[in-house]
Amino acid sequence: MESVGDVLKRQPSRFHYQDLVQKIMKDPDVAAFIQQESLTPEELNRSISKFNQYITERDKFLRGDTDYIAKGYKPILVMNHGYADVSYEETPELIAAEKEAAIKNRLKLINLPASLKKASLAQVDLDDLGRLPVFEKLLAFVEQYPAIRKGLYLYGDFGVGKSFMVAALAHDLSEKRGVSSTLLHYPSFVIDVKNAIGDGNVKTLVDEIKLSEVLILDDIGAEQSTAWVRDEILQVILQYRMQENLPTFFTSNFNFEELEQHFARGKHGNDETWEARRVMERIRYLAEETRLEGVNRR
């Protein structure tokens, strides 16, 4: 950092000390600080080099110089035991970026597009009136959480935006309630669980999911269902979340009746209706069946 003395040594023919001091004192930011803090003559003398440092750093900041090292922070003047000093505070842009990063860090997406982290309820297209009932329920959940615990089971046609809606919910829960959510593509999770059998990691995968603060199972019913996955994986997750009263959301192309039929189809055509109903009892307890209307957006 170049001091006042360095400036005078470098350009002795152009600057005299008093001329430089007057130039520094006339700087609008410096003058405002002097008036605000009611600096005495002694304090002014002790502060000249810091005022010069401030002006240099401020101008670099405003120009966006590449050699400005405190990226995301702007220089400010503060009092420091009888003289002015230079400090740095976060810019509004850095604060906003850090806030958005914190929001996204609370959203865990598993086998889903990272772009869903950008979704928010404010982006929901309400010109499509079919979305309004679901939008209102999701908004109410955010506003009333944690008093409200029951999730939604969103079903509807392919491409109407079910995944976007629940991702928007997760974003707003993070932003407004500081809540962490796990958004999980269920068919891919089923494959991951099957692959984990050989490694002995099934319990680790299941525990990670069932303990989520808010859990969203996306596209349930699209997986290749087996009795083992249904009874030993899904039911374990749902049972835990039911017992602990943890918010759980679902999306599906099936309504409740169709999903039960999906779970009831055994590997060899066996009727497994009773087992399917046990799973559905837990889903019904955890989530309200809600149809999402709308146009295909894909």
Residue spans of the language-model regions?
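N-terminal nucleic-acid engagement/recognition segments and initiation subdomains in replication
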Residues: 1-71
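Interdomain "pre-motor" coupling segment immediately N-terminal to P-loop NTPase/helicase cores
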Residues: 55-112
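N-terminal pre-Walker A segment at the start of P-loop NTPase domains
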Residues: 114-148
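Walker A/P-loop nucleotide-binding motif
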Residues: 146-167
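Post-Walker A helix-loop "phosphate-sensing" segment adjacent to the P-loop in P-loop NTPases
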Residues: 170-182
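Structural recognition of the conserved hydrophobic beta-strand(s) that form the central parallel beta-sheet
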Residues: 183, 216-218, 247-253
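Conserved nucleotide-sensing/catalytic segment adjacent to the nucleotide-binding pocket
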Residues: 194-246
